[in-house]
């Protein structure tokens, strides 16, 4: 017996194809390099979900996960044939399901993935010791941030800027007279002049839901 087509209503963020390509590139890179245990499903692997372009499963624990559905050809009667959309859902194996917004999804992901400041980070920073940095700043958006967190972020950003200036100065001191090593270091510090200095993404970029849905319209 043929299964009857059923319609559902859900929250969808309209996004551009460029946003999807950028986010998917970051995620698939980290999946291939085993940095993230996320699951990527092609459209032909998703059954009975029409207009689903692809799907990502983000496990949070043994009992729950976030599901990211990327849709295409939205609302053809409005002429949105080339439009794409993103739906975010939270699932619990006991049967609970709800829609989540990008900010909430990022905070949930940050709890299970990516490093963050520890309780001892302030003391370690004051003593000049090494401490764990927050590598997923998107996970703190929308929160009322404490003075300790704001101080750590400002201090960490200062360290990164000083490190970048030091590396650029060292590379410049090598000069082009130092042979291939000097030329390579100078190019690395100054960036390529042949193409745009803005890369589409790099290996250190985060697969944030805000990155995927930013600029999209809630429909």
UniProtKB/Swiss-Prot annotation:
Residues found modified as Phosphoserine: 146
Residue numbers carrying Phosphothreonine: 98
Annotated InterPro entries: Vif (IPR000475)
Region: Multimerization, residue numbers: 153-165
PTM annotation, UniProt: Processed in virion by the viral protease.
Membrane topology summary: Peripheral membrane protein
Motif annotated as BC-box-like motif, chain positions: 146-155
GO BP annotations, alphabetical order: viral life cycle
Cellular location(s): Host cytoplasm; Host cell membrane; Virion
GO terms under cellular component: host cell cytoplasm; host cell plasma membrane; membrane; virion component
Signal peptide extent: none
Keyword tags: Host cell membrane, Host cytoplasm, Host membrane, Host-virus interaction, Membrane, Phosphoprotein, Ubl conjugation, Ubl conjugation pathway, Virion
Main location: host cell
Induction: Expressed late during infection in a Rev-dependent manner.
Superkingdom of this protein's organism: Viruses
Motif HCCH motif, residue range(s) on this chain: 110-140
Similarity annotation: Belongs to the primate lentivirus group Vif protein family.
Subunit-level organization: Homomultimer; in vitro and presumably in vivo. Interacts with viral Pr55Gag precursor and host APOBEC3G. The interaction between Vif and APOBEC3G is species-specific, which may play a role in restricting the replication of SIV to their host. Forms an E3 ligase complex by interacting with host CUL5 and elongin BC complex (ELOB and ELOC).
Free-text function comment from the UniProt entry: Counteracts the innate antiviral activity of APOBEC3G. Forms a complex with host APOBEC3G thus preventing the entry of this lethally hypermutating enzyme into progeny virions. Functions as an adapter molecule, recruiting APOBEC3G to the ubiquitin-proteasome machinery. Targets APOBEC3G for degradation through the assembly with elongin BC complex, CUL5 and RBX1. Binds viral RNA and affects the stability of viral nucleoprotein core. May play a role in viral morphology.
Note: Vif-defective viruses show catastrophic failure in reverse transcription due to APOBEC-induced mutations that initiate a DNA base repair pathway and compromise the structural integrity of the ssDNA. In the absence of Vif, the virion is morphologically abnormal.
Domain writeup: The BC-like-box motif mediates the interaction with elongin BC complex.
Record protein name field: Virion infectivity factor
